[in-house]
Structure formats: structure tokens, C-alpha cells
Amino acid sequence: MKFDRRITDEIYTSDTVRLGENAFQAMQETIYHNGGVGTITGYYDAELSILSVSDLLLHNLNHSYASLMEQTKGSLKNLFYKKDATFLDNAHFRQIKGEGEGRILTADGSPVYVRLYKEDVVDTNGTPICIMSV
């Protein structure tokens, strides 16, 4: 008897087409380095807008996609615990690559410590995006 140990995960986004193949390859890379419990992608705009979030991350934070987007106002800046969010300054955040630690907020607002792994790619329009396994 064989068991399929692969875990499948849904990716929620407002624009699937924009992620592109290189984004999915970068997601695999971040998961490889972090053992990934979920992924989240975002843009390097003023608000660090959330592009996509995996179902597994939503589950671990006790969120639905709608509730996460409402709580964070669609911004990575509002996902992280404010006292730990100094690295989310746009210029600094662009320079970060690889692994780190931080605290993100669950649905009830409680901060939880997480390991992060961040990679940068571009979407299908050539716009830079970040991909993190959390």
C-alpha cells in the first residue's frame, strides 16, 4: 500500500494570471528553505499590497481570505506585529532576501512568532513582487 504524502495547498489571489510561472518556482524555493507552513506574495508599492496568500497560511492564522484582507487592509505592513514591523520600510524590505524571524498577527490579533524565507521575482507584467514562506 502506497501513501501519497504530498500536501496540496490553494493559493488565494485577486489576480492569478499575474503571478506567473517564475513566482510558483520561487514559492517552491522559499518552501524548500523554510519547511513552509504557508506562502504569501506582495508588491513593493507604498502599502506592500498583498497579491496572494495560501490556504495553509490562512488556516494557521485562523483566517479566511476575506477576513485576512479586511484585517490587514490588503497590506503586508498590517500583517506583522507593529513592534516588529520596522523592517517593512519599503527601501529596507526590498533589500531583504533569505531567512528571518518575526511576529505576525492571527485573526484575533494575537502575535505569533514565525520563521520567514523571502525571495524576489517579477509578475507577468514585469512588476517586482516578494514571495515569503511563513
Residue spans of the language-model regions?
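PAS and related sensory helical modules
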Residues: 49-51, 58-78, 85-86
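Short, flexible coil/linker elements and helix-boundary hinge sites characteristic
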Residues: 15, 35, 62-63, 70-73, ...
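Residues that form generic nucleotide/phosphate-binding pockets
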Residues: 30, 79, 91
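Short, positively charged
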Residues: 17-24, 82-85, 98
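Structured N-terminal alpha/beta-domain signature
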Residues: 41, 53, 57-58, 76, ...
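PAS-family sensory modules
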Residues: 1-49, 124-134
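Per-ARNT-Sim (PAS) sensory domains and their PAS-associated C-terminal
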Residues: 1-7, 83, 87, 91-130
